[in-house]
UniProtKB/Swiss-Prot annotation:
Protein name per Swiss-Prot or TrEMBL: Cell division topological specificity factor
Keywords: Cell cycle, Cell division
The organism's taxonomic lineage, starting at the top: Bacteria, Bacillati, Cyanobacteriota, Cyanophyceae, Synechococcales
GO biological process, one term: cell division
Pfam families recorded: MinE
Gene3D superfamilies according to UniProt: Cell division topological specificity factor MinE
Protein family membership: Belongs to the MinE family.
Stated role: Prevents the cell division inhibition by proteins MinC and MinD at internal division sites while permitting inhibition at polar sites. This ensures cell division at the proper site by restricting the formation of a division septum at the midpoint of the long axis of the cell.
């Protein structure tokens, strides 16, 4: 996702049909190069979302995992909107800080 894409999304602008077609073509090419089926990509998406959801609250409907190709390199890109951190993670950080403080005193 380019800076222009981010700004357009924030401004509520819809991408031009040519941009959508280009994105679809890049996705098809990336799938062909990696030999990943759409079913496998969806399974990976679900697993990635479930792992990330252990640590932060995410928007499952808006979460997207895609393949992007740039300069002959294909990347798996996860765009996961985070709603908030989970209280368990905060406790882990606090516990870690307490452990470090106790070690410093010893």
């Amino acid at each position: 996702m380019t800076l222009r894409d981010i700004l357009n999304k924030l401004m509520g602008r819809q991408p031009a049909s040519a941009a959508k077609a280009r994105e679809r073509l890049q996705l098809v090419l990336a799938h062909d190069r990696t030999d990943l089926s759409p079913d496998l990509l969806e399974q990976m998406r679900e697993e990635i979302l479930s792992v990330v959801a252990k640590y932060v609250e995410i928007d499952f409907e808006e979460g997207a995992v895609s393949l992007e190709t740039e300069d002959r390199m294909t990347a798996l890109v996860a765009n996961l909107p985070i709603k908030r951190t989970l209280s368990g993670e905060i406790k882990i950080k606090e516990q870690s800080s307490a452990d470090n403080s106790a070690k410093a005193v010893s």
